[in-house]
Each structure stands twice: as C-alpha cells, then as structure tokens.
Amino acid sequence: MPTGAEIILPWWLFVLMLALAVLALLDRLFVPSVRWFWRRRINRVVDEIGQRLQIEIRPFQLTKRQVLIDRLVYDPKIIEDARKLAREKNEPLELVQAQVAKYAREIVPAFNAYIYFRIGYWIAKQVAHLLYDVRIGLAHKAALQSVPEDATVVFTMNHRSNMDYVLVAFLAAERTTLSYAVGEWARIWPLQTLIRAMGAFFVRRNSGNPLYRSVLERYVHMATHEGVCQAVFLEGGLSRDGRLRKPKLGFLDYMLRSFDPQRDRDVVFIPVGINYDRVIEDRSLLRSLDQGAEKRSLWFVVRTTVRFILKSFWLMLISRWQRFGYACVNFGEPVSVKDYCREHAIDFRRLPRPERFEAVAGLARVLMEDIRREVPVLPVPMLAAVFDAHPQSWMTATQIERRAVKLLNRIAARGANVYQPGRDRRPYYVAKALDLMCMRHFIEEQDGRYRLNPSVADIMRYYANSVVLASEGKGIKPETAAEKEPLDAPT
C-alpha cells in the first residue's frame, strides 16, 4: 500500500472502535478512581455508624458475597448431604453441587452499609411517617442495654402487616442492622437488589427440598454463629384473623441445633409486639380465609393497588390526606438462650431430633407469650373491641371511652404491657379513632351516637382480636352486671 493512501472505514465500524476505545479508557483510568472513591465513602459510613450503634456491624456482613457463597458451597455438612443425595438419585456429584451453588446464590445477601443507612433507612423512615403516626410504645431500656455486645441478637415479632419490615428496620436502625428472611414474593427487579443490599435473604416458604433446606440451615447457622443481628417472624406468615398464629419452629431449630451453651456467643431473643390502627392489607387477609371467595387476578391486584396509590397522592395534593392512625412497636425483655439452657438443663446439640423439636417448641411458647404481652393496644383496635362486644348498641363518645378504659384496665391486670393515656388525653384518642372508623365506614353515626356497621363485622373483629390476644389464654372476663351501663337508641 503506497504511503499516504487513505483508509476508508464504514461508519458503524468507526463508531464501534471509538466506543471500545472509550470503554478501555474508562476501565483503566476512571473506574479505579470511582471504585476507590465509593470504597472510601462506604468505609467512612461504616466507621461513623459503628460508633453510634449499640450492636456493631459484624465482619460477616462486610465479607464479600462471593466469599460467603463459597463458604456455604464447601461447608462440610453440605458436601456430605450433596454426596448422599447424589448416591440416592444416582446423579453426578458435580450436578448436585451446581444445584447447591444455585441455592447459595439465591440465599446469600449482598449487604451494603451505605445503601442500608443512607438509602434504605431514609426510604423506610419516609414511608413509615407518611402512612402512620409512628410510636415506640414501651421499651425495657435497661434490659436492652445490658445485652452483651458480642451476643447474637434476634428480634422475634408478631407478623401483622408487610409494613412490619419497614417499621422495625427503621425503628431499630439506631441500635443495629437487621437481617430478614423474605419470601419469594419480593424477588422482582429492582426490589430484589435493594432487599439483598439491605442484608435480607430470600427463602422458599414450605419448601420440601432437603438439599435446599440444608443450604438454608447452614446459612442461618453461619449468620447466627457470626453474631449477625436478625429479625424473625415466629408465626411464619401474616395473621389472617388478627390473632397470633402457632409458631413455626424451623428457623429457631436452625439457630439452636448446633448451639454450644458453654463456648458459643450467647443468642438473645428480644420479643417485639407490633400493631396498627389500620393494616393496609386487612380486607385481603380476611378474604383469604373465605374458601368460597373468587380468586382475584394479578391484573385486578395491580389495578387496585395503582388506584389506591393515585387516590392517596391526589388527596395529598388537595391537602385532604390523613395518615392511617398510629403504628406502634413495643420492645420486651431479652431472653438469653444460655440462661434458658442453664435453667432448663438443655443442650440442643445432644438431643435426638424429636426431643430437640420439643425443646425448641418450649422456647417458642415462652417467646410467643412474651410477644403476646408486648402487642400494643391502640385506639382503633381498642374501640373495635368495644363495638364488637356491643354490636347492636348505640353509644356516645363518652360511653365508648368508659368501656374502653375498663377493658384496658382488665387487660393490664392480666400482665399485658399497655400504655395508659392520661385522663385529659383520652377524649382526643377516642375522637381520632372514631374519625378513622367513620372514614372507613366501620361504624354508623347518628346524632352524636355510634354503632357497629353490620356489613363490616368481620373486619371489626379482626382488629378487636389484636386487643384480645394481649391476654389470650387467660381470657378477658366479661363485664359484670354492675359494670354495664344502659345504652339508649338514638332519638
């Protein structure tokens, strides 16, 4: 080719070469600088937050995700289970190990402290305060502060709403980070990425796959052994009728089956009670109990949700938005597993499977009773209990208040931790709750008197059940004849 001859390239090839050159430049010059910038910023956030957290971020949470996946895949117990399964199914071990790796990638989170505290915390706080008047009701501060710094703290909670994840993560963020087990419903983009970055991990509810359960068990064991603070819904799912469900023992068993009370760090359970003046999913939860109800399509669910969101935004724009009342969380007294094992002469490691499950069930009963006592008694559920007890009666606000106070006193007398508002604040709480209930057509109002709307008696009982469970098992005594008041029909 003669010197100085022109070389003609197609435009598409020139653009492609230019793009590759730019990418190479970015990869060699800019990407390392950006990576260094973000790493320094994240480390600064971790150091800053670590100074104010009561329970510090564990090294396990800051370990690279791929390292944790490899630890899980090559865990001796999982390798043993994989070999056993390969022999039983007459499959190559490599095929079974590939399945193990898939499960490990599915389960292991990708905790990012910057996203957790700078993005996740901000979103949780804004959403919680947008929807509710958020309160921490009762907290045993001295007992909570006495928890050893190296202990594995596990918040055990009742599951009232999907808002529980947001509410507890936001309220506990001043003390620690939380790792949740989240159902497969949340495995959609971009929610899946955000949830993993927040330290949560996905689980397949009611999975009967022994290999999957083995991988999940070892991950829970690793996280517990390394001191990761966790949040567990012992019921294993949302309450459908407002009452506490029977506890699921799987996660407790995973945490405790290898627990050495002499050498391992202590595992401390903190009972948490959650309640709302309005549960966003209340009608859907009740509908799920109706076996004859027509199944709603995905399109119906999406359409209804979008309409609800748009209506809420419109009410905000015209300054007519009202929050859904109170959302309250009570933190109970910690339960030390080491102390529990010592008091009951239990070593979970040495028990055969049936006896171990019975011992785990005994601890679960203790925790559920503690949770039951901590469930907050809020204005709307309290008034719902009053209306549910007197479905045909027309009552004035004063009569409703008196009946609510009597019920509150009976619940408190049976050991439930309830907040007793001052006498001068009671009319305010009653009036606010009545407004919320009228707005949702739970009650009928006529000439300053109120009565239960018969068409929503099931929803009223759903809210009333959260009050009854505060002393469930001991029963709430009915009013005596002397306590009852004459209730006149409106004129």
Predicted region positions:
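Membrane-interfacial terminal anchoring regions of lipid-handling membrane enzymes
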Residues: M1-A231, G236-T491
